[in-house]
């Protein structure tokens, strides 16, 4: 059987390939790829985001759908939002509790083959050795800089 791993960043793709070479399945590879993508391109995904997956297991003739989207925090006060027709993207109430990590573990529990700790190995190595920051990540970090965050500190 042939496999293919595709992601927006070469290091993420290589992590997924390495998992397959080490006996992991497509789910293990997808999780490891997503974990590394969150390291090398956190502006695209990562532990602070959500996860949605449509999984097809060969021979089962049915899809599995995972919605691991975030939910509102327990202290949300909807009355404080009544003056808004839309919640501004930079408002604290626009943020949810992240669901990505919960999604990784849910997928792994049901479909994974390797140990979960093995799926983090490439990300840990990349964090330890460092990596070249892409122009996209540089721009994203520049846009959401300390100065921008300070401008909204009274909103919190």
Description of each model-found segment:
Residues 1-14, 18, 26-150:
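Noncatalytic scaffold domains of N-terminal-nucleophile
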Residues 151-156:
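A short, hydrophobic C-terminal helix/tail in secreted or cell-surface proteins
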């Amino acid at each position: 059987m042939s496999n293919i791993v595709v992601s927006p960043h070469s290091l993420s793709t290589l992590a997924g390939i390495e998992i397959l070479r080490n006996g992991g399945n497509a789910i293990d590879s997808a999780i490891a790829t997503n974990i590394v993508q969150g390291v090398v391109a956190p502006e695209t995904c990562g532990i602070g985001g959500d996860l949605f997956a449509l999984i097809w297991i060969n021979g089962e003739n049915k899809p599995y759908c995972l919605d691991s989207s975030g939910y509102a925090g327990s202290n949300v006060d909807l009355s404080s939002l009544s003056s808004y027709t839309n919640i501004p993207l930079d408002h604290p109430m626009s943020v949810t509790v992240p669901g990505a990590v919960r999604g990784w573990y849910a997928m792994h529990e049901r479909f994974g083959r390797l140990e979960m700790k093995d799926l983090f190995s490439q990300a840990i190595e990349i964090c330890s050795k460092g990596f070249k920051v892409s122009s996209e990540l540089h721009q994203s970090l520049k846009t959401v800089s300390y100065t921008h965050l300070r401008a909204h500190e009274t909103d919190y």
